[in-house]
């Protein structure tokens, strides 16, 4: 899929005083672009999200603060750092192989009951940790769960804390409609049980 020039203009360029070189586009959305980047010293690969600062004020700051608060859990995508680069902000994360949605739809090996249990336990453990730190994701869906590999025994990582909150009780509805709990759909006041 061809991308707009503003998306591809960073390919081959370095950021963070030459520490990271942007190599490929992983995806583009409404507010940002995610690239694969390599650490020029260690050779390690990372996912780097680029956001125009006009869009990164309050919401992106909140997202990164909440993500950083829970990033130490082994099943939460690791957030490494924020890079200020003039007009843009770059957010550096561990690089994963894909998302759970892709695994479920395209791969037959995900029909293994033991694998499903292991994945489910990893997700529940990550959410329990997030809740113990006062962070409520509110947009949990297969696309927001990244995977370590697209075959074999996989590890999963909860990602995308863009709708996360610290409010244990809330009456506002948010999330992806197909994945929202009935309580969210009916706009009743709900607590942390609904705020996965």
Region locations from a protein language model:
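Juxta-kinase regulatory segment immediately upstream of eukaryotic protein kinase catalytic domains
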Residues: 1-15, 23
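Conserved N-lobe ATP-binding subsite of Hanks-type protein kinase domains
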Residues: 33
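Conserved N-lobe beta3->alphaC-helix segment of eukaryotic protein kinase catalytic domains
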Residues: 50-71
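Short beta-strand micro-motifs within the conserved protein kinase catalytic domain, predominantly
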Residues: 78-87, 97
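A conserved loop-to-beta-strand element in the N-lobe of protein kinase catalytic cores
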Residues: 86-94, 101-102
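Activation segment signature within eukaryotic-like protein kinase domains
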Residues: 119-120
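Catalytic-loop of the protein kinase fold
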Residues: 131-148
């Amino acid at each position: 899929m061809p991308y707009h020039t503003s998306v591809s203009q960073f390919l081959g360029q370095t950021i963070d005083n030459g520490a990271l070189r942007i190599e490929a586009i992983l995806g583009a959305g409404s507010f940002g672009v995610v690239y694969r980047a390599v650490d020029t010293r260690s050779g390690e690969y990372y996912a780097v999200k680029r956001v125009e600062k006009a869009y990164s004020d309050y919401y992106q700051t909140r997202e990164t603060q909440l993500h950083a608060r829970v990033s130490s859990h082994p099943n939460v995508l690791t957030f490494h750092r924020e890079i200020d680069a003039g007009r843009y902000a770059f957010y550096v994360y561990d690089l994963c192989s894909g998302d759970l949605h892709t695994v479920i739809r395209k791969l037959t090996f995900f029909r293994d009951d033991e694998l499903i249990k292991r994945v489910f336990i990893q997700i529940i453990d990550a959410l329990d940790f997030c809740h113990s730190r006062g962070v409520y994701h509110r947009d949990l869906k297969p696309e927001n769960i990244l995977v370590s590999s697209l075959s074999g025994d996989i590890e999963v990582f909860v990602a995308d804390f863009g709708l996360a909150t610290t409010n244990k009780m809330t009456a506002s509805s948010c999330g992806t409609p197909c994945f929202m709990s009935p309580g969210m759909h009916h706009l009743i006041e709900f607590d942390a049980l609904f705020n996965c």
